UniProtKB/Swiss-Prot annotation:
Residues 14-37 have a biased composition (Basic and acidic residues). Residues 1-13 have a biased composition (Acidic residues). Regulatory subunit of protein phosphatase 1. GO terms for cellular component: nucleus. The gene is ppp1r7. Gene3D superfamilies: Ribonuclease Inhibitor. Belongs to the SDS22 family. This is Protein phosphatase 1 regulatory subunit 7.
Amino acid sequence: MADEEGETEVQEMEVDRRESDESADDEAKEKPDRVDGGVKNGEVPLGEADAPVDIETINLDPEAEDVDLNHFKIGKIQGFEVLKKVKTLCLRQNLIKLIENLEQLVTLTELDLYDNQIRKIGNLETLRDLQILDLSFNLLRRIEGLESLSHLQRLYLVNNKISRIENFGTLTQLRLLELGSNRLRVIENLDSLRELDSLFLGKNKITKLQNLETLTNLTVLSVQSNRLTKIEGLQNLVNLRELYLSDNGIQVIEGLENNNKLTTLDLASNRIKRIENIKHLSELQEFWMNDNLVENWSDLEELSGAPGLQTVYLERNPLQKDAQYRRKIMLALPSVRQIDATFVRF
């Protein structure tokens, strides 16, 4: 009887290409629009009027806690002093050039200025309760003006023109920092961020993993689409669970000896020839290794120490030329339920 008759029938169902929580390809955080905009009337969304909106024509509710003026043609921050209880202020996708006139909004905990024309961070000194600040997609060149925000927990500075990591000394409660799509070359000045949980540095010009020693609480690190050639400097990150290093120039898998808690390892689109030095990663669930130079089937033995491995990406490696590509992966890694973009059902 042929071997095929005794093997379990495999059904395949196409699924979407993998998506990282980090969304490091664009590192741009998406948020749903808030239902309660805190606006009574006078709303004029962007595109419905030829001239910029005069904020004085918008009747703000003084009792509103959540105010959403997303996608208006607001050119200047003004008239918000009537908001006595506001906690969340969303001014996304406007024409704002200057952070100003927010001094009286001392109850504010979240300020969203994503996608404006702001060139400098400033005038935030009185917003001491601020926990979330989004200045992504602006024209910032420096990180500054944050000294008074000691309660800040999440800071988004994606897609600006920032060339240096600096001035984080007082942000000791920061848990999430997004600096993707900037002009950074060096990882530095993060020593004080001991509570940091997630760090996103994708799409910069970083050449070395360094100066991460004090970030022992870090669970997510993304340095995708940079200029790395070596995995190093991660020995103190013992709580790291997700590591994204795709689209670099890495040649060898190494330097992960102390990262035993990794559940996701993304090394796609590098120059790696061997799967090695990861047999100790027993908690690994997702391993992305597509678009590399792996050609030896025996390398899959390195993944045998992860009984919970669910997803592997190995497409566009020399291995894929084998006619039995998928079957060999399933035999070597019986726990896997997704190979590349296809689910496997036994």
